[in-house]
Amino acid sequence: MLAPVRTVAPATMPVSLSEAKAHLRVDHDDQDDLISAQIRAATAWLDGWSGILGRALITQTWRQEFGRFADHLPLPLAPVTAIDSVSYFDAGNVQQTLDTGVYDLFADARGAYVTRRSGQSWPATFRRADAVSIIFTAGYGAAADVPEPIRQAILLIVQRLFDGADTSIDAAIEHTVHALIAPYRKSLI
């Protein structure tokens, strides 16, 4: 399994500039660029395959590649909302798209995965690291659909970045952020 690649980034951030400014009690536009950058930084820390949550926050598209078909083809993000396509390199090294009637999307305690339907079989593939490619959509949807604890964690991170270093509040904010995101962290079973 190769590292996943985001092919379509989210259209928006989970927290808007106006929401962050209201949280920070900032009523001028002088620091909009700074606050926007801090929203992006806080979101990047949480979002996507490399984010601490291992989740897609806003709807986005990813590609996961495998060296071959298997009973379970795990997808590394949650929540997965759709399989857009499954393609493969056939025995002659020609890329083909698999019919949607051959596979299903399921999720268990370990996360989402693609498996073949009963009575179906996987086609033979050419031997290469990217023999099978799954394009999938993941994310909660729009910003308003992101769970509120995650949105609040982003606002607290932005607040911490905006206020600068103050060791007396750092520990409290860090503890609160981790408490807010704990239920959403992808657990390894």
Annotate the PLM regions.
Residues 1-189:
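Divalent metal-cofactor coordination and adjacent catalytic microenvironments
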